From Swiss-Prot:
GO biological process, alphabetically ordered: regulation of secondary shoot formation
Full protein name: Transcription factor PCF6
GO cellular component labels: nucleus
Assembly mode: Forms homodimers and heterodimers.
Annotated segments matching region Disordered: 1-29, 127-163, 282-308
One Pfam family named in its UniProt record: TCP
All copies of domain TCP, residue ranges: 52-110
PROSITE patterns linked: TCP
Family matches, as InterPro entries: TF_TCP_subgr, Transcription_factor_TCP
Biased composition annotated in UniProt, kind: Polar residues: 143-156, 285-296
Length: 358
């Protein structure tokens, strides 16, 4: 059972409060602490600022903040309500005040409360300012919640997008700067990419240096607009052969520098594949008539080398940036794809002639 001790501040309780202020120990304590009569309003702990109601307000006491409602036992509640009915009061607070006034002589004999216990109680001005400050904060929070809830409309959505876009220019600018810096670095390094030809070729185990490595590769460069040419990277050689490869034709492509094609003027997309200064041929002997006049004997020496049989443990596929010193950077001649096809056609006819003779 609960009995509301302070249901209302008006009504019949005014006289009771006046009596407490003049005589009872509680009134004297209040006067000693606050220095004025009727300062009970300063001891109200209002909860309206936090969303509560006035009837849920609490009070400051010597032992801290306490609730205004008092829980009674069953027997005490029955006696209290019987007394309230006998007094003819419609509010429990009036019956409580009557009881306090009737017990005033006994209350006066009780020891007074320690004024130091009320040192933490704020003054009237501070108590009035705190709810006002809390109320303003609550109003601001409600306005922000309303604005957030009303953002479902198209206008609010547009404003939210504008705020988001306005807060992102710094990030966008930094990302754009990074892109520009990356493109500039790629353009500056285009020549270096062109200088190293991308190739995969055939290696001859057992021979060291450039003489034992017949690393002849195909290099292609593709250029899109003003972007630097994209190609493979010079790779160490890998070797392969198969059992019974004595009569197999040995194909090779000579390694050479990859010349970066000039970027097109209009920013148009241009797919440009260029072959290195090697030629495609079959190792059926030295064909001087089909070989370019500017090919050196060094390349012919490599074309004469035989591939060894494959050992399963020696297969290596290596792709990466090879040192430029391993393969000479000097270009000994350029040959177009048409010339390579013609050279291959000559080898094919030569092979057919040898078969017909046999």
């Amino acid at each position: 059972m609960e009995a509301a001790v302070g249901d209302g501040e008006g009504g019949g309780g005014g006289g009771g409060r006046g009596k407490r202020g003049r005589g009872g120990g509680g009134g004297e304590m209040v006067e000693a602490v606050w220095g004025q009569t009727g300062s009970t309003a300063s001891r109200i702990y209002r909860v309206r600022a936090t969303g509560g109601k006035d009837r849920h307000s609490k009070v400051y006491t010597a032992k801290g903040i306490r609730d205004r409602r008092v829980r009674l036992s069953v027997a005490t509640a029955i006696q209290f309500y019987d007394l309230q009915d006998r007094l003819g009061f419609d509010q429990p607070s009036k019956a409580i005040e009557w009881l306090i006034n009737a017990a005033s002589p006994a209350i006066d004999t009780l020891p007074s409360l320690d004024p130091a216990a009320f040192a933490a109680i704020p003054h009237a001005a501070a108590a009035d300012a705190a709810p006002t400050r809390r109320r303003s904060q609550q109003q601001q929070q409600q306005l922000s919640n309303k604005s957030g809830c009303s953002s479902t409309s198209e206008t609010s959505k547009g404003s939210d997008k504008e705020v988001t876009v306005a807060s992102a220019p710094a990030q966008a600018a930094s990302f754009t700067e990074l892109l520009i810096a990356g493109v500039a670095a790629s353009s500056a390094g285009g020549g270096a990419i062109g200088n190293g030809a991308d190739c995969v070729g055939i290696a001859h185990p057992g021979k060291g240096g450039a003489e034992g490595a017949s690393t002849y590769g195909f290099s292609a460069a593709s250029s899109f607009g003003d972007a630097p040419p994209i190609g493979m990277v010079p790779a160490p050689p890998f070797n392969f052969s198969a059992p019974g490869a004595d009569m197999a034709a040995h194909y090779s492509l000579a390694q050479d520098q990859l010349a970066a094609p000039p970027p097109p003027a209009g920013g148009d997309y241009n797919l440009n594949f260029s072959m290195s200064s090697g030629f495609l041929g079959a190792n059926r002997g030295t064909l001087q008539s089909n070989s370019p006049s500017n090919m050196s004997g060094h390349h012919h020496h490599h074309h004469q080398q035989q591939l060894q049989r494959l050992d399963g443990s020696t297969i290596s596929f290596l792709l990466g940036h090879a040192a430029a010193a391993a393969h000479p950077a000097a270009s000994e001649g350029q040959i177009t794809s048409t010339a390579a096809l013609q050279l291959w056609d000559g080898f094919r006819h030569s092979g057919m002639k040898e078969k017909s003779k046999n």
